[in-house]
């Protein structure tokens, strides 16, 4: 028998001390035993050093707080749900979870309704909740998200008229109607949990109608009101805007009837009321019915302060009501006096219209004259050729009467 060679030095490097001296020559059996005795402690020590941390890691951190995919097997939802201590520990995080489905997943009755990967309680619950929220809307809360119901107990989608509300309003208002309606259904186990905190079953019927009423009622005021307001405003605008002075709104009706008649009297007859009628004071104090309608036409043409004097000129016939063939020449330049031009009526005597530029009056003076209701203007020709009273008094009907005559 040949003697066995000593063990190679690489197998003996694991020890801390120097390699032992070679064994004295002996039989092969003794040398083999010595080799085994020398190698076995090293192998055990080596294995314990390499594999020990792995075992300790698994035992110390199992189940890990944030399990990975390979550790999901350790947190079985069915085992966790039926374990009394684990359910108690997992209930607080789920009840306080801001996610709308947190409260539902603690119930044990949910295990049969939802796939195992989605209804988890206990230690590993929060992770599936965080990683797998999308499957929940169709399963437990289908109606609330406007999705087809998954169980016989869920209310039809038609009753849930607020698909967008769960995201815009507090959970209490959105989920309470579903909870009230789902109590007799397969998710009846959740009723006791939801009803104490946010259970208001009447809202299941009141919520959708309130939405429809809320949209229907605003529609009613918004729809009719724009139509009514313009309708109400239109009738009020003509009387307010057409006669500038303000007391004239009563006269446009009669004026419309008599508008064609007094076209010639202002030029042919010179009784004091017609001269006065052209002045702004005539419109303020109340004049013959025929003139306010004309003033309304004039007022519409020039909505400035200057329009107060032209009303009298419009009473002469240049308003929209008189025939278009009439022309009112300026007393100075003999050109036509248009509605859009500043014009002054000689109320004192000749009853002729004059352009403001032809009389040499400034805009500021013209504004003061037209805004003064009791002012009476006379042209230069009448002042030179006629005796014009310096003071005139307007009577109740707005007629001009000389102070010395009265």
From Swiss-Prot:
The keyword DNA repair does not apply. The modification N-acetylalanine is found at residue 2. Keywords: Acetylation, Metal-binding, Nucleus, Phosphoprotein, Wnt signaling pathway, Zinc, Zinc-finger. It is found in: Nucleus. A zinc finger (PHD-type) spans 327-385. Residues 1-73, 106-323 are annotated as: Disordered. Pfam families: PHD. Binds to BCL9 via the PHD-type zinc finger motif, and thereby becomes part of the nuclear beta-catenin/TCF complex. This is Pygopus homolog 2. It comes from Homo sapiens (Human).
């Amino acid at each position: 028998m040949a003697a066995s060679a000593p063990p190679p030095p690489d197998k003996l490097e694991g020890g801390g001390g120097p390699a032992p001296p070679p064994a004295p020559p002996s039989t092969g059996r003794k040398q083999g035993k010595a080799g085994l005795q020398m190698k076995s402690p090293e192998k055990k020590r080596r294995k314990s050093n390499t594999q020990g941390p792995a075992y300790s890691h698994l035992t110390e951190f199992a189940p890990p707080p944030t399990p990975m995919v390979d550790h999901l097997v350790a947190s079985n939802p069915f085992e966790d749900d039926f374990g009394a201590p684990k359910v108690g520990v997992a209930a607080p995080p789920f009840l306080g979870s801001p996610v709308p489905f947190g409260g539902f997943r603690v119930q044990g009755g949910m295990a049969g309704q939802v796939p195992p990967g989605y209804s988890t309680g206990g230690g590993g619950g929060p992770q599936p909740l965080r990683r797998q929220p999308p499957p929940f809307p169709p399963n437990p809360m289908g109606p609330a998200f406007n999705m087809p119901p998954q169980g016989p107990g869920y209310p039809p989608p038609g009753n849930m008229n607020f698909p967008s509300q769960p995201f815009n309003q507090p959970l209490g208002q959105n989920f309470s109607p579903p909870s009230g309606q789902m109590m007799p259904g397969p998710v009846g186990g959740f009723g006791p949990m939801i009803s104490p905190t946010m259970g208001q079953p009447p809202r299941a019927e009141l919520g959708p109608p309130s939405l429809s009423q809320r949209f229907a009622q605003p529609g009613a005021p918004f729809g009719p009101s724009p139509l009514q307001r313009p309708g109400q405003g239109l009738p009020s605008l003509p009387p307010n805007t057409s006669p500038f002075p303000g007391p004239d709104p009563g006269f446009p009706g009669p004026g419309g009837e008599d508008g064609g008649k007094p076209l010639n009297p202002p030029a042919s007859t010179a009784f004091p009321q017609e001269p006065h009628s052209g002045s702004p004071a005539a419109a303020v104090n109340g004049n013959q019915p025929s003139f306010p309608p004309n003033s309304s036409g004039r007022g519409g043409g020039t909505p400035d302060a200057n329009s107060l004097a032209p009303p009298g000129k419009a009473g002469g016939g240049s308003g929209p009501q008189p025939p278009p063939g009439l022309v009112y020449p300026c007393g100075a330049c003999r050109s036509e006096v248009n509605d859009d031009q500043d014009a002054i009526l000689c109320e004192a005597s000749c009853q002729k219209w004059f352009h403001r530029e032809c009389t040499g009056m400034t805009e500021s003076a013209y504004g003061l004259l037209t805004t003064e209701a009791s002012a009476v203007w006379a042209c230069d020709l009448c002042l030179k050729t006629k005796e014009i009273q310096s003071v005139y008094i307007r009577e109740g009907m707005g007629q001009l009467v000389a102070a010395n005559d009265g």
